[in-house]
């Protein structure tokens, strides 16, 4: 799993952790439903999770569009509810699941 956090939003560490967790849970649910064999492989491989910082909302949207070109890559777009630090509807995190080759 790869998570791209929107660096332009200046979220606290706790907020970033929560947004990444939302994306991870969403991807996990998608894997259970759509790609159970890939989920099993990922679990047997150590459940690798990588978090990187994106520069902007535009960058996350571009990455999402590129990922959706490959039907084997799962995506999770997290938009904030606006209850704490960030304006409602802000794209906070993009979660991606695929093989290393697919995500590079």
Regions found by a protein language model. Name each.
Residues 1-34:
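Glycine- and Gly-Pro-enriched alpha-helical subdomains that act as flexible
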Residues 2-4, 45-55, 68-104:
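Short basic, glycine-rich beta-strand/loop surfaces that mediate nucleic-acid
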Residues 8-10, 15, 38-41, 77, ...:
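Residue-level preference for alpha-helix termini and adjacent loops
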Residues 12, 19, 34, 42-45, ...:
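Surface-exposed loop/turn and secondary-structure junction residues enriched for glycine/proline
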Residues 13-14, 60, 87:
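Alpha-helix N-cap/helix-start motif
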Residues 18-21, 65-69:
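Short, solvent-exposed amphipathic alpha-helical segments in soluble enzyme
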Residues 29-47, 53-57:
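Compact, glycine-rich, soluble single-domain proteins
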Residues 58-66:
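Short, hydrophobic/π-rich interface segment
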